[in-house]
Amino acid sequence: MAEQTEKAFLKQPKVFLSSKISGKGKRPGKGGNRFWKNIGLGFKTPREAIDGAYIDSKCPFTGTVSIRGRILAGTCHSAKMQRTIIVRRNYLHFVKKYQRYEKRHSNIPAHVSPCFRVKEGDHVIIGQCRPLSKTVRFNVLKVIPAGASAFGKKAFTGV
């Protein structure tokens, strides 16, 4: 089980902890003392979500959040918050008067499950879900490390 650091007892709502039989299930959410699911949309469930011991009700793989709506990609701009990052999306806006493009960006806060290790500069794919807080409406689905992608910590990488 996860380390109990909160005042309330942390547990997954769909797992019965007092079971006399403990076996690892091979199908999503079946057997064992850990609930996990396949979110679909072509995204694989991370090994850390299946084998890990963390408890996160807002995790799309082990929690009660479903991914629906938009799937976006961007670069992690800030990872200073707990379990939340800022994803920067760069784009070009056409100015009709001058027949030119100008650089613009948008910042999107997204929840990060503890099964991911995200650093600034990493390329992430996020999916829309129900509102998780006042500003957070997206969840991280996949992380591509900064060294593995062509993107970096640069402010604007172009389109």
Swiss-Prot record:
Q: PROSITE patterns per the record?
A: RIBOSOMAL_S17
List the InterPro entries.
Answer: NA-bd_OB-fold, Ribosomal_uS17, Ribosomal_uS17_arc/euk, Ribosomal_uS17_CS, Ribosomal_uS17_N
* GO (cellular component) term, any one: plastid
Positions of disulphide bridges: none
Source domain of life: Eukaryota
| UniProt cross-references to CDD domains, sorted A to Z | Ribosomal_uS17
Q: Which GO terms describe its biological process?
A: translation
- Which keywords appear in this protein's UniProt record, sorted alphabetically? Cytoplasm, Ribonucleoprotein, Ribosomal protein, RNA-binding, rRNA-binding
Report the subcellular localization.
Cytoplasm
- Where is this protein chiefly located? cytoplasm
**Which SUPFAM superfamilies is this protein grouped with?**
Nucleic acid-binding proteins
GO MF annotations in UniProt: mRNA binding; rRNA binding; structural constituent of ribosome
Pfam families membership: Ribosomal_S17, Ribosomal_S17_N
Family per record? Belongs to the universal ribosomal protein uS17 family.
Q: What is this protein called?
A: Small ribosomal subunit protein uS17x
Q: Which organism is it from?
A: Arabidopsis thaliana (Mouse-ear cress)
Q: Which gene encodes it?
A: RPS11C
